[in-house]
Amino acid sequence: MMMHTRKRIFRSPATGPQVQFTDPFSVSPYNNMASRKRKADDDNDDMSVSPLSSPALPSRPIVRPSKKIRQANDDVAARPLSLPRLLETLTNDQLRTVLQTICERHPDIGHEVVTSAPRPTVACALDILAGYQEKLHDATPLGHTNSDYAYFRVKQQLGALLDAISDFTSQFLPPLEQQTNISLQFLDGVTKVIHELPDWENQSHRHHKDAAYDEISAAWALVITEASKRGGGFIVHTGGWDQRLVKHNQQSGGKMGQAINALAVEVGWQGQNPITDTPAPSGRDPNSILNQLINGAYGSPVRVGPW
């Protein structure tokens, strides 16, 4: 870097021409200021190319997902519920009422429902009867369980329970129900329901319970008779149904005599006849397979000839 030199004039003591020369070591203050200014300019130039002072890159706008604005259009309109949604809102009672109404208006649909619906199970049928039984108990006034006042208060609920007993009993009888064990399971459960029917003080009101005993006794007799024809009498003995029937007859006060007679005649009930307290007949044929199984004689050698 070149430095500005300051010219100085020296005069000799003697008179003569003036001599001028330049002092290389003396610097003018003006020259010093100029050099500082150039240095500052150079620094500014250096800073202009520095990354810190470089112009910022243009920022890229952030793309945000645009919100779909739902505008009112023809899709927003009043319309009824679809069939699946409508069925979700119905209670069991409402659904049964609607289905029953449709079946009554269209007998062909009713027939298809009857043939397509699964058969009720014993547990399901007894559970429904328990529901009717609970309604009967809820309608009974406190402190008047067997009076005439209570009878007229629960007459409607009593009739509904008796109708349900009759309808379900027919469902579990042969030939609709081919399995003897299932028929006997239902009869055992429904007989317990009949035992719990009110014993009205007025004799004229007791015909409901007496009629129920007559019907269920006939049902027991039918199942036992059909079981003996198919060789199912052995199930009655081995399953303990004969003993249960005897207890039911005792609890009813001897009102299930028809079933007891069928048990004694068709199957061969072993023990005392609960009606006459005499030994019950062992069946029509003492040499039947059932009696041989009971007596332990089945499979024993059979003698042939006079000896």
From Swiss-Prot:
Could you tell me where this protein is found in the cell?
Cytoplasm; Nucleus
Q: Which GO terms describe its molecular function?
A: proteasome binding
Tell me yes or no: is Protein transport among this UniProt entry's keywords.
yes
Region of interest (Disordered), ranges: 1-63
Composition-biased stretches, type Low complexity, lie in 48-61
Subunit-structure text: Binds the proteasome.
Q: What is this protein called?
A: Tethering factor for nuclear proteasome STS1
Organism whose genome encodes this protein: Podospora anserina (strain S / ATCC MYA-4624 / DSM 980 / FGSC 10383) (Pleurage anserina)
